[in-house]
Curated annotation (Swiss-Prot):
Phylogenetic lineage: Eukaryota, Sar, Stramenopiles, Ochrophyta, Bacillariophyta
Annotated protein name in UniProt: Small ribosomal subunit protein uS17c
An example Gene Ontology molecular-function term: rRNA binding
Family: Belongs to the universal ribosomal protein uS17 family.
PANTHER family linked to this entry: 40S RIBOSOMAL PROTEIN S11 FAMILY MEMBER, SMALL RIBOSOMAL SUBUNIT PROTEIN US17M
Subcellular localization, as worded in the UniProt entry: Plastid, Chloroplast
Keywords associated with the record: Chloroplast, Plastid, Ribonucleoprotein, Ribosomal protein, RNA-binding, rRNA-binding
Length: 84
């Protein structure tokens, strides 16, 4: 079974070895055909705590690491220009 992957933006890194990643998905409205944007937040494991707010990351599904954490940061796609 292939591993699920999602691309998102880090919105919080205040926890130890954990980041909050915002993932946007676009889909057409079934009646009006307008493109809708659905946003979902995932807790992802960041072993080295190297992600910063605004970084674009690739997250992969993994085994449950805690009550809400089932994703891990696979790689950082692009770094943010924000200095934190």
């Amino acid at each position: 079974m292939p591993v699920k992957e999602k691309v998102g933006v880090v919105i919080s890194n205040k926890m130890q070895k954990t980041v909050v990643v915002k993932v946007e998905s676009r889909y057409p409205h079934p009646i009006y055909s307008k493109t809708m944007i659905k946003t979902r937040k995932y807790l992802a494991h960041d072993e080295m705590s190297e992600c910063n707010i605004g970084d674009q990351v690739l997250v992969q599904e993994c085994r449950p690491l805690s009550k809400k954490k089932r994703w891990s940061v696979a790689r950082i796609i692009s770094r943010s220009s924000l200095i934190t």
